[in-house]
């Protein structure tokens, strides 16, 4: 949870804890610049995370902007994920936990070399208005390489096989990082 350990263009898996050390949520934090970070919580906990961060920062000059309604996340995971990403014109040659942001003809895109499956993977943060376009393009190219869509159930199976924790399962406000094996 120490952003001083990463530099702009890097992501970090972090735990947002309450005053008692319980895990409010596990999040990815993207350091876009020294004065700009992007926090991606689990969708089910977005309002709780935003409320917690706003409460903690209320007496500071830090501005919190909730983009959960205007942003969509599409994950592309698996051995051919880099080929799929590059086939739609996005950069795929990224080291793990690195990301780039770009403006495209189809809106702003953050391409992150992250994922929650144990496979090589990417997560795209796209403008919600362009999500259908990106989904369609990614799906066509993934299917051409033998890939197919899968939902959170598939992701949950893969993350369980890898031993990755998930809030609401191995993590909760009554479980601290040490108890979860994430210290």
Model-derived features: where do they sit?
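Basic, glycine/lysine-rich polyanion-binding surfaces/domains
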Residues: 1-183
């Amino acid at each position: 949870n120490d952003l001083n350990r990463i530099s702009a263009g890097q992501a970090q898996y972090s735990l947002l804890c309450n005053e008692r050390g319980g895990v409010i949520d596990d999040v990815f934090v993207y350091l876009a610049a020294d004065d700009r970070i992007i926090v991606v919580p689990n969708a089910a906990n977005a309002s709780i995370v935003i409320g917690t961060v706003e409460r903690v920062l209320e007496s500071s000059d830090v501005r919190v902007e909730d983009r959960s309604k205007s942003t969509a996340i599409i994950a592309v995971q698996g051995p051919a994920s880099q080929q799929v990403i590059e086939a739609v014109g996005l950069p795929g040659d990224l080291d793990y936990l690195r990301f780039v942001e770009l403006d495209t003809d189809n809106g702003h895109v953050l391409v992150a070399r992250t994922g929650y499956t144990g496979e090589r993977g990417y997560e795209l943060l796209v403008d919600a208005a362009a999500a259908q376009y990106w989904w369609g393009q990614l799906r066509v190219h993934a299917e051409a390489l033998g890939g197919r869509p899968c939902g959170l159930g598939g992701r949950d199976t893969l993350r369980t096989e890898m031993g990755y924790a998930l809030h609401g399962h191995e993590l909760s406000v009554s479980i601290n990082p040490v108890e979860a094996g994430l210290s």
